[in-house]
Amino acid sequence: MSYAPSGPDGSTSGPTYREWVLQPQSEYRFELAPNTSIGIKLLDGYAECYGTELATRVVYLFGGECKAVIYTHSGCTIEIKPATEYTSEETAMGHYQSASILFEQMRVLSLATVNGALLDGLNPQNIPATPPHILVLGPENSGKTTLCKALINYAVRGEHDEWSPILVNVDPGDGAWSVPGSISAASISTPLSTSTSACPLGLSASTAPTVWSSNALIPLTYWYGHTEIQRNPVLLERIIRNLGARIEERLVQVGSQGRASGLIIDTPPAFASSSSGDRRNSLIKACIESFKVNIILVIGQEKLHAEMQRTYGRSINVIRLPKSGGAVDRDPAHRRRVRNHQIQNYMYGQKIAVPDGCDKGEGSYLFQHEPTSDLSLAPSSTVVSFDDITIYRIGGESMAPSSALPIGASRAVSELLPLHVDPSSPSSGVLNSVLALLASAASDGEQYDEELVDLPVHGFIIVTAIDIPNRKMTVLSPTSGTFTGQTAVMASIDWQEIA
């Protein structure tokens, strides 16, 4: 590795940028502090960010406490403004690329089998001729989301450009395409970019008007309402199975190419922790059954790999991959800031300022492959009546102790029971709560409250003010609209706008 420590005027003091010459199979790593941004330009050679190829002579902006790497397999020169961070020749991307080749072969063989084109002797390695359904497990700060994103990006930019694998996120602490507390899935057909920690899996159609098709994702979302799986694991298992059932319905409807594309599941770090107990095992089993998993990828942990091999190795291929050296520790304070940024991003969109050292008139500054000016939203603040929106809480703090349950009743029933919330009650906790607006039930018949847990989400709002005497509340939403007759669910996720 090397760099050219000179400024735009050729001086050698106080450079505003650096030119890094990356050797083959090496990567440039950076971690951004709050309220900072950098611009990265590929000058020559080949480079990618988690499988998304960078174009030459285009400035890519990164901000929002982004922690990422620029990797090259053949060598390249990049320009960084302002000068920051370091390079490393220790990278796990080669291992991730090898895994992606295996999954590509599975897709091709699966499609050939469906089309009747697979002939005996053309698969000497006995690679499974089934779509790859991949469950990714690993401890906290192991780079699970990074691996999932890289595998998706390698799939959609390969020789078969019509692959559209489904990316599933069952980590409620992540937020993915919406807000923390949710789990979701989306079909991906073009690469996902990395520019900010608030958009770990790219943008969705609900976050801002976009141009590039990969950002116009319409995810299927279910509301859990907490960031920790221990809060209500019964509810989490229920919505994981609901999500799996909806994905199965979609796979029946799509063509053979879509089914052969497979899916990749990102999981919470608690799935890798033995301290989570039996609930953790039941949630892993729910994922395997609901998404028909045939491959388990374990990042780093040898003990976890041995456990998964012992439990599922007879029917599922369990593979261990090394943890990337670029995976960094995120302390609780950082995670809280990121979750706050995700909610703010959902409401207001995202814009990264051009960093110091970059000429404001220089070329195109892209964020998520979009012009930076196109990513802001103008959220709507609306006053609604308490009677316009029916609010529920699923189990949670209002659950009765086991000793108080009726004879024969089970805790599982209580954990899934919707409880009506009265906003006029001082103890309701509605103020500053994130409310998930539920989609309408498909059936025209009589609906029961118990069925609310099975409904997906079509949007989120935040209660910013309560007027108890007039029985009104003010809600913030990304777009304007009417909320009359809506059903919403609240839990433990809240947000306050900071001036």
Stretch-by-stretch model annotation:
Residues 1-138, 142, 150-154, 158-159, ...:
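Preference for solvent-exposed, low-hydrophobicity sequence contexts
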Residues 117, 137, 161, 166-263, ...:
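Nucleotide-state-sensitive switch-loop elements of NTP-binding domains
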Residues 145:
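Walker A/P-loop
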Residues 148, 240, 280-281:
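Amphipathic coiled-coil/heptad-repeat helices and related helical stalk/stem segments
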Residues 211, 278, 283, 448-450:
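Short, well-ordered helical secondary-structure segments
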Residues 246-316:
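Phosphate/Mg2+-binding loops and adjacent switch elements
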